[in-house]
């Protein structure tokens, strides 16, 4: 329950933020709340079953990711969802959950150097296929999160450091080449981040409106439903990518600090759990699972808040427990319930 309480209060911040800017989303947000909380306690009760059968869930969602790539619902040029009529299922969000368990299993297998090298190759091939499919949706944000989770778990694994070092060097050498595979709008977002004044009404519009929203909130905010930038729709994606700006505009600097404190509590409890497993050599897999969960929440939080503050490029990464959306909201609570 230590993990649930900070997440619960963060989700309340998200609920009231959405309520203040989009009354039309109240019913669906309430439905996601009920579904997420029910799923948390259900998965928590049968957590051992889900952890033992992670492989089935991982490969099932992996298959759904491939299906999404072929026949997924296309919105604004992106094909990221499967339409289940009552729910748009974003397979990449749920795959992140079981990807952590996949990596923890394969990266903690003991054996000779050659066996560990084989395990590393298996892990990286699976990782590259997943990132390729997500990148082609296109969903740069989730591709980045998968990459960061993989890197952090790899650094904390039993894989020989020489193998890891060579991989990181190769990755950095190839990184500049990714520029040529980015969509035009993704390149424009990076350029707008480097020079926000280049196009006020175009590529820089989102960042500028987000900064204005954050600044206009003052210390205690404009009040619930009184955020002019967010409620009057000057701020695009005010309930998803830029919900932190909407939150600060309504609840002010004080509200923003409270959100950071709640995240801090969540990371404190997660770190405490990781250190507990670290002290026990037989718990290396559970240690790596918790490290992956920390990376999952931490990087999404940092990147989302960073792009809302104008200090990171816009990548479409949502804020855990706060941003509106069923798949991300539900998968985050399921992941909490699966903590060993």
Where are these regions (language model features)?
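TM-adjacent membrane-interface loops and short helices in multi-pass inner/ER membrane proteins
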Residues: 192, 196-240, 251-255
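A juxtamembrane structural motif centered on a specific transmembrane helix
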Residues: 18, 299-340
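Hydrophobic alpha-helical transmembrane segments of multi-pass inner membrane proteins, especially
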Residues: 4-203, 245-309, 334
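Transmembrane helix boundary and interhelical junction motifs in multipass membrane proteins
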Residues: 139-144, 222-227, 238-240, 257, ...
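Residue-level recognition of oxygen-bearing side chains
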Residues: 94, 219, 329
């Amino acid at each position: 329950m230590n993990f649930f309480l900070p997440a619960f209060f963060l989700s309340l911040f998200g609920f009231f933020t959405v309520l203040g800017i989009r009354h039309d989303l109240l019913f669906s947000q309430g439905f996601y709340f009920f579904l997420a909380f029910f799923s948390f306690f259900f998965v928590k009760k049968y957590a051992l079953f889900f952890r033992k059968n992670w492989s089935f869930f991982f490969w099932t969602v992996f298959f759904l990711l491939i299906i999404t790539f072929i026949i997924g619902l296309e919105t604004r040029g992106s094909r990221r969802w499967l339409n289940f009529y009552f729910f748009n299922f974003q397979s990449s969000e749920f795959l992140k959950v079981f990807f952590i368990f996949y990596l923890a299993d394969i990266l903690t297998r003991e054996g000779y150097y050659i066996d560990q090298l084989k395990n590393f190759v298996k892990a990286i091939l699976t990782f590259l296929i997943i990132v390729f499919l997500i990148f082609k949706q296109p969903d740069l944000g989730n591709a980045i999160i998968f990459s960061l989770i993989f890197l952090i778990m790899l650094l904390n694994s039993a894989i020989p450091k020489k193998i890891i070092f060579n991989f990181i060097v190769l990755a950095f050498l190839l990184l500049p080449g990714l520029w040529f595979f980015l969509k035009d709008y993704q390149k424009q977002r990076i350029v707008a981040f480097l020079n926000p004044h280049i196009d006020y009404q175009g590529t820089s519009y989102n960042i500028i409106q987000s900064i204005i929203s954050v600044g206009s909130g003052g210390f205690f905010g404009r009040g619930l439903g009184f955020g002019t930038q967010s409620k009057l729709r000057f701020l695009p994606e005010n309930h998803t990518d830029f919900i932190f700006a909407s939150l600060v505009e309504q609840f002010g600097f004080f509200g923003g600090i409270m959100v950071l404190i709640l995240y801090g509590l969540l990371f404190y409890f997660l770190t405490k759990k990781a250190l507990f497993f670290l002290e026990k050599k037989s718990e290396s897999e559970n240690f790596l699972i918790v490290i992956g969960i920390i990376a999952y929440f931490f990087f999404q939080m940092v990147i989302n808040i960073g792009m809302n503050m104008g200090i990171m490029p816009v990548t479409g990464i949502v804020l855990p427990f706060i941003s509106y959306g069923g798949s991300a909201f539900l998968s985050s609570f399921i992941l909490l319930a699966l903590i060993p």
